[in-house]
Curated annotation (Swiss-Prot):
Highest rank taxon of the organism: Bacteria
The protein, known as: Glutaminase
One BP term from GO: glutamate biosynthetic process
PANTHER family: GLUTAMINASE, GLUTAMINASE 1
Classification of source organism: Bacteria, Pseudomonadati, Pseudomonadota, Gammaproteobacteria, Enterobacterales
The gene coding this protein: glsA
Catalytically driven reaction(s): L-glutamine + H2O = L-glutamate + NH4(+)
Example of a GO MF term: glutaminase activity
Key words of the record: Hydrolase
Pfam families: Glutaminase
Parts of the chain that traverse the membrane: none
Species this protein is from: Shigella boydii serotype 4 (strain Sb227)
């Protein structure tokens, strides 16, 4: 049994130490994100037995952004299986910025990773669907199953992104021209943009992590969301590419599968134990929450969790 007092103390200490840390700036290329109050900071744990611990304004809802890639990857694995995902998308870190097209040019149009923009758009196109709305509803539903029923599309975020996503549209057409997109290019880009535009809070984000930690069983709803055999593939991708250019550094220092988003959210998974999540809008140059990284790493270190420790 996990010690409840110890878990709450770890969360409280991480929050106290880092919630006012200076550094970084909000993503400014998406108007909605540029206007989120920069002083916000939250950290939370959800355990595999369904207990919740948090510090900060855990009710504040923020844009899921790139963390949505984890959910869509999970659905693709359920739909087509791990071999098809590896063959059609890839399972390798790019070593490049999350929105780069260089890897596409170097590898014949194959995106390599489902956790960078090119691979994520391709993954969205892999989802079994007869039309754009079915594709979108299935992705929204998996987000809700993994994290909580309150996860919903923000029209304000979506509008802000749909009017500025020219680079992703270009990526979609590059994928299409190379034969690595599996539906209409603008359908894939539209749905991908929507999946990034849902709102979530930090406890729900930690619940997503706890669901992965529990092998696909949501510890709060007690419903199986994913086949247990598919979860290791998700965690492997998170370890390799979850924090973009910081992924290697994160694996070296923290040693947990993680995923960040430019909305300021960050997630880590302790397999078999818990999900740890944080939110704070100012980002480093790679697009990861400055305070969020520190808070999640602090919780993991205090509790002694690192998958490489054995």
């Amino acid at each position: 049994m996990l010690d409840a007092n110890k878990l709450q103390q770890a969360v409280d200490q991480a929050y106290t130490q880092f919630h006012s840390l200076n550094g970084g700036q909000n993503a400014d290329y998406i108007p909605f994100l540029a206007n989120v109050p920069g002083q916000l900071a939250v950290v939370a744990i959800v355990t595999c037995d369904g207990n919740v611990y948090s510090a900060g304004d855990s009710d504040y809802r923020f844009a899921l952004e790139s963390i949505s890639k984890v959910c869509t990857l999970a659905l693709a694995l359920e739909d087509v299986g791990p071999q098809a995902v590896q063959d059609k998308i890839g399972a390798d870190p790019t070593g490049l910025p999350f929105n780069s097209v260089i890897a596409l040019e170097l590898h014949g149009g194959k995106p390599l990773s489902p956790l960078v923009n090119a691979g994520a758009i391709a993954t969205t196109s892999l989802i079994n669907a007869e039309n754009i709305e079915q594709r979108w509803q299935r992705i929204l539903h998996i987000q809700q199953q993994l994290a909580g029923e309150q996860v919903a599309l923000s029209d304000e975020v979506n509008q802000s992104e749909q009017t500025t996503n020219f680079h992703n549209r270009a990526i979609a057409w590059l994928l299409y021209s190379a034969g690595y997109l599996y539906c209409d290019a603008m359908e894939a880009c539209d749905v991908y943009t929507r999946q990034c535009s849902t709102l979530i809070n930090t406890v729900e984000l930690a619940t997503l992590g706890a669901t992965l930690a529990a092998g696909g069983l949501n510890p709060l709803t007690h419903k199986r969301v994913l086949q247990a055999d598919n979860v290791p593939y998700i965690l492997a991708e998170m370890m390799m590419e979850g924090l973009y250019g910081r992924s290697g550094d994160w694996a070296y220092r923290v040693g947990l599968p993680g995923k960040s988003g430019v909305g300021g959210g960050i997630l880590a998974v302790v397999p078999g134990v818990m999900g740890i999540a944080a939110f704070s809008p100012p980002l480093d140059e790679e697009g990861n929450s400055v305070r969020g990284q520190k808070m999640v790493a602090s919780v993991a270190k205090q509790l002694g969790y690192n998958v490489f420790k054995g």
